[in-house]
């Protein structure tokens, strides 16, 4: 009898909390969710020397954040630093760091802690793409993809998460990819690294949830191709439904998701529907849709930036 009462109580609590969370989600779907103030927050952005990382730095500069910029490209990173100051940032710190090297990450992280303070918003943005078919891709390039696109997240989390937990305040941002949701022809190593980054960020979020560390937020971003040069030459078969994203639009959406403490951000919105279809459609139907949207041959025109130099 007592077992039945206990089970019933547990069920009612579960149903009540579930209903409340659904109602809350519906309300915020209709009304704008409040945005948090990031003025004075120490924001670390990896891969800040160009592309998406640079644009993210400029957005946070306008919001009054303290910027910590990491990139392996010293010249590009210093240029971003200069642009951030021109955009209104009063405190900007640029560090040359190869995020693929664990020892280097830990060394520069210690510098940041001593010279700037505890990072409260960590944006793992640094990424590389080889754009080669699996059997054509040298082992060292595949290893480099994993080192930059995934393993760097392990080292930066290890370096900065403890202080966030101690302060019960922090935000972990993973820039994954639509290629971290579904396999793509010509991107085997990239997809694998982005799947890993997604799964890692989600798992650490679950750890913080179970440990009731409510002050630690997570945002996982999965965009389709962005016009930053990284995927130059890539195409889409249906631009009206699945466009290659403009960098300004992508950055605005990413920053908005961070300010609203949104867990998942897929861009464009069609990706949410595509992931839903993938869960139940027959394989052949899914492949037909991918072919229609041009996804199966999106990488055919890819231009390797290293070959251009």
Swiss-Prot record:
EC nos: 1.1.1.105
Topological category with respect to the lipid bilayer: Multi-pass membrane protein
UniProt key word NADP: yes
GO biological process: keratinocyte proliferation; negative regulation of gene expression, epigenetic; negative regulation of transcription by RNA polymerase II; retinal metabolic process; retinol metabolic process
CDD domains for this protein: 17beta-HSDXI-like_SDR_c
GO MF term list: all-trans-retinol dehydrogenase (NAD+) activity; DNA-binding transcription factor binding; RNA polymerase II-specific DNA-binding transcription factor binding; transcription corepressor activity
Tissue distribution: Detected in adult lung. Detected at low levels in adult brain, heart, testis, placenta, cervix, pancreas, uterus, stomach, rectum, small intestine, colon, esophagus, thymus, skin, and skin keratinocyte. Expression is higher in psoriasis lesions relative to unaffected skin from psoriasis patients. Detected in fetal kidney, skin and lung.
Catalysed conversion reaction: all-trans-retinol--[retinol-binding protein] + NAD(+) = all-trans-retinal--[retinol-binding protein] + NADH + H(+)
Keyword Membrane found: yes
Binding positions (substrate): 177
Pathways per UniProt: Cofactor metabolism; retinol metabolism
Annotated transmembrane regions: 11-31, 270-290
A GO cellular component annotation in the UniProt record: nucleus
Keyword list, A-Z: Endoplasmic reticulum, Membrane, NAD, NADP, Oxidoreductase, Transmembrane, Transmembrane helix
Main location, first listed in the record: endoplasmic reticulum
Family the UniProt entry places it in: Belongs to the short-chain dehydrogenases/reductases (SDR) family.
Record-given protein name: Epidermal retinol dehydrogenase 2
Organism name: Homo sapiens
């Amino acid at each position: 009898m007592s077992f039945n009462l206990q089970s019933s109580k547990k069920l009612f609590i579960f149903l009540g909390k579930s209903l409340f969370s659904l109602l809350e989600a519906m309300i915020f779907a209709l009304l704008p969710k409040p945005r948090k103030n990031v003025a004075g927050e120490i924001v670390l952005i990896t891969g800040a020397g160009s592309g998406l990382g640079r644009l993210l730095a400029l957005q946070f500069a306008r919001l009054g954040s303290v910027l910590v910029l990491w990139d392996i490209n010293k010249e590009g990173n210093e240029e971003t630093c200069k642009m951030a100051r021109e955009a209104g940032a009063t405190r900007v710190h640029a560090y040359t760091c190869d995020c693929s090297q664990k020892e280097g990450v830990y060394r520069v992280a210690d510098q940041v802690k001593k010279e700037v303070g505890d990072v409260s918003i960590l944006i793992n943005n640094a990424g590389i793409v080889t754009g080669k078919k699996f059997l054509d891709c040298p082992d060292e390039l595949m290893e480099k993809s994993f080192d930059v696109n995934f393993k760097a997240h392990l080292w930066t989390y290890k370096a900065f998460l403890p202080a966030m937990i101690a302060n019960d305040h922090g935000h972990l941002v993973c820039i994954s990819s639509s290629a971290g949701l579904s396999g793509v022809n010509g991107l085997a190593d990239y997809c694998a690294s982005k799947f890993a980054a997604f799964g890692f960020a989600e798992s650490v979020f679950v750890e913080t949830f179970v440990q009731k560390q409510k002050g630690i937020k997570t945002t996982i971003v999965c965009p389709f191709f962005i016009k930053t040069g990284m995927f130059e030459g890539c195409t889409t078969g249906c631009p009206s439904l699945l466009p290659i994203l403009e960098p300004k639009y992508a950055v605005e959406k990413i920053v908005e998701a961070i300010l609203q403490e949104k867990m998942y951000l897929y861009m464009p919105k069609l990706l949410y529907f595509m992931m839903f279809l993938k869960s139940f459609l027959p394989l052949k139907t899914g492949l037909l849709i991918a072919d229609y949207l041009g996804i199966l041959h999106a990488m055919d025109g890819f231009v390797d930036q290293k070959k251009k130099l």
